[in-house]
Amino acid sequence: MEIIVKDLIKLWGKPVNQEKIDLQSPLGFVSTDSRTIKKGNFFIPLVGNKFDGHDFLDKVFSIGIQGAIVSEKFNGLVPSGLPHWVV
């Protein structure tokens, strides 16, 4: 089953910074590990006892990720232009 970005909008509503997102684009590979992210992937930052994946949003954005999920508890800055959903 192919999931497109538009399907995510049905689940979570419109993303923040949606101007650069193709709604008909298939969802790329989903990763929680910033060390393995490639262009076109979708990033879900995990929060652990020793790290916070949100700290790597700038890094994965510079690689060219398709979008990300961001915790509503995250107090830092999300890169300008990064399509993301706050959950």
Predicted regions and their residues:
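N-terminal leader/targeting and accessory segments in enzymes
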Residues: 1-87
